Amino acid sequence: MYGIEYTTTLIFLILFVLLNYILKSITRVMDYILYRFLLFIVIVTPFVNSQNYGINLPITGSMDTNYQNVSTSKPFLTSTLCLYYPTEAETEIADSSWKDTLSQLFLTKGWPTGSVYLKSYTDIATFSINPQLYCDYNIVLMKYNANAELDMSELAALILNEWLCNPMDITLYYYQQTDEANKWISMGDSCTIKVCPLNTQTLGIGCLTTDTTTFEEVATAEKLAITDVVDGVNYKINVTTATCTIRNCKKLGPRENVAVIQVGGSNILDITADPTTAPQTERMMRVNWKKWWQVFYTIVDYVNQIIQAMSKRSRSLDSAAFYYRI
């Protein structure tokens, strides 16, 4: 009887030792596989071009992230505001500390010191070439000039809307505008644009494709020109390319972190006459002009009401960046 018990105990011991050996062997094999796999990953990773879908987002044509209109009472606590003004304002004020004064006045409206940036520009035409709107909210002051109404309205149309633009090779191709949202935008020191409409046989309608002097001139020596032609018709285009670039652009919608304040003038410029522009006069406003200090006082006093008509954006507009998007 004792022999049977000893034999049973011995069998259990042997099985236990065998099982322990098997488990240790499996553990060593798994460790070997795991370490070799990790080593393989470390070696191969530098040679693999993987995409981070959270960073490399596809281009949709909009430089900005859409947000709803601001509903909080103090969006400025975490936001920046850029105020663009003509240099003649500085000349008239003639005070080296005027910006510090304005900063203190903005502080009374809840805008912390350092959150408001004052940026000057020479004139509307020059500003049109390279508008750079870097802040969460951007307010552009444009002094009314009867001789520059076209420049003012085109600049407003440019910065109050988002555009998706492609380069145009006018030496090789004909171009047509597909719908009312499709425009040709030209920028440069001097832009003269001529067009020749073509029939179905690519022959000029009232012009010769080989003679640019017969083309129809739609813009002359402008710094910013937004050209609108008859949709669905091919055109041969001539542009002063040495001093101007032209892009085929599509209006995507309003750029709601920008407001234009017209300073002076009997009437406010109306860019909503364009059927592709949704009514947005709340971001195209007018203030009376007497002295520039009066203008800035008015802006400070009503800045928060102006902001309520806008939407904060997370990205900036640099015309060089937006203009070369494809």
From Swiss-Prot:
One of its GO terms (cellular component) is host cell endoplasmic reticulum lumen. Ca(2+) 2 binds at residues 177, 228-229, 231, 301. Residues 1-50 form the signal peptide. Glycans are attached at residues 69, 238. Keywords: Calcium, Capsid protein, Disulfide bond, Glycoprotein, Host endoplasmic reticulum, Host-virus interaction, Metal-binding, Outer capsid protein, Signal, T=13 icosahedral capsid protein, Virion. Its main location: virion. Disulfide bonds join 82-135, 165-249, 191-244, 196-207. Residues 165-167 are annotated as: CNP motif. N-glycosylated. Ca(2+) 1 binds at residues 95, 206, 214, 216. Residues 253-255 are annotated as: GPR motif. It is found in: Virion; Host endoplasmic reticulum lumen. GO terms for molecular function: metal ion binding. Belongs to the rotavirus VP7 family. Some rotavirus strains are neuraminidase-sensitive and require sialic acid to attach to the cell surface. Some rotavirus strains are integrin-dependent. Some rotavirus strains depend on ganglioside for their entry into the host cell. Hsp70 also seems to be involved in the entry of some strains. HAMAP family: Rota_VP7, Rota_VP7_A. Homotrimer; disulfide-linked. 2 Ca(2+) ions bound at each subunit interface in the trimer hold the trimer together. Interacts with the intermediate capsid protein VP6. Interacts with the outer capsid protein VP5*. Calcium-binding protein that interacts with rotavirus cell receptors once the initial attachment by VP4 has been achieved. Rotavirus attachment and entry into the host cell probably involves multiple sequential contacts between the outer capsid proteins VP4 and VP7, and the cell receptors. Following entry into the host cell, low intracellular or intravesicular Ca(2+) concentration probably causes the calcium-stabilized VP7 trimers to dissociate from the virion. This step is probably necessary for the membrane-disrupting entry step and the release of VP4, which is locked onto the virion by VP7. This is Outer capsid glycoprotein VP7. It comes from Rotavirus A (isolate RVA/Cow/Thailand/A5/1988/G8P6[1]) (RV-A).
